[in-house]
A protein has these predicted regions:
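Cleft-lining beta-strand/loop regions that shape enzyme active-site pockets
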Residues: 2-189
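Conserved functional hotspot residues or short segments at active or partner-binding sites
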Residues: 205-213
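Short acidic, Pro/Gly- and aromatic-enriched capping/linker segments at domain boundaries
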Residues: 190-199
Length: 213
């Protein structure tokens, strides 16, 4: 749109290209040609909403080990997970690694839904509410290992902790983040906002996943 991008860094260029989905901008580039010069070219780019997949990678590794990298619990990752898992089983996977490293959480219901795939009908607790695994599981016997690290938080800790507490998976990695509280924003006078802790997450053994300073 007539703005020069020369000399700008990636963050500055990215900021200039962002906009509402459905809007467009003109991008003019100089493409090197066979004569040693540049050929100016102009493109009209239409912006679209970008949604990163909840499962950026899934594959059958050596020794028939299925691997699923689950990056978020936002959106509808349980459907993506189910499809990926069933595809791995068709490819011959006899064990499963669920990679939750760097997964900061998302929707608790999605974590319960994925736990449902590997647990008999039971309970996962959250404060005074009870979340039940209601559907028939996909596989009660496949060996599972869950990878975690300091970036594993919230719904990720609920899933990994529940699978561990119910003797359904082995947890491998470092200490997780410890995000076990629920905050609700409250409006304050003069436009301020305060987050108030209203509840805690508990996994089946009764442990709260919140870190203690």
């Amino acid at each position: 749109d007539g703005k020069d991008l020369a000399g700008k860094n990636n963050a500055e260029v990215s900021q200039m290209l962002r906009g509402q989905a459905g809007t467009s901008f003109k991008l003019k580039v100089n493409r090197p040609n066979a004569k040693g010069g540049n050929t100016p070219m102009e493109f009209t780019i239409v912006r679209e909403s970008i949604q990163n997949p909840a499962i950026p990678y899934a594959a059958v590794l050596d020794n028939q080990v299925g691997y699923i990298n689950l990056s978020t619990f936002s959106g509808n990752p349980s459907k993506e997970f189910k499809k990926a898992f069933l595809d791995l089983k068709k490819q011959g996977a006899t064990s499963l690694v669920i990679d939750l490293r760097g997964n900061g959480g998302g929707l608790l219901d999605e974590a319960v839904e994925i736990a449902n795939y590997f647990l008999p009908r039971g309970k996962i607790k959250q404060a005074s509410n009870t979340y039940k695994t209601l559907r028939e599981p996909l596989d009660l016997d496949i060996p599972i290992a869950v990878l975690v690290n300091s970036g594993t938080a919230s719904a990720s800790e609920i899933l990994s902790g529940s699978l561990q507490d119910l003797d359904r998976a082995v947890i491998v990695g470092s200490r997780t983040f410890g995000k076990g509280l629920v905050q609700v924003p409250r409006s304050l006078p003069y436009g301020g906002t305060m987050k108030v802790t209203t509840s805690k997450y508990y996994i089946p053994s009764g442990r709260c996943v919140q870190a203690i300073d």
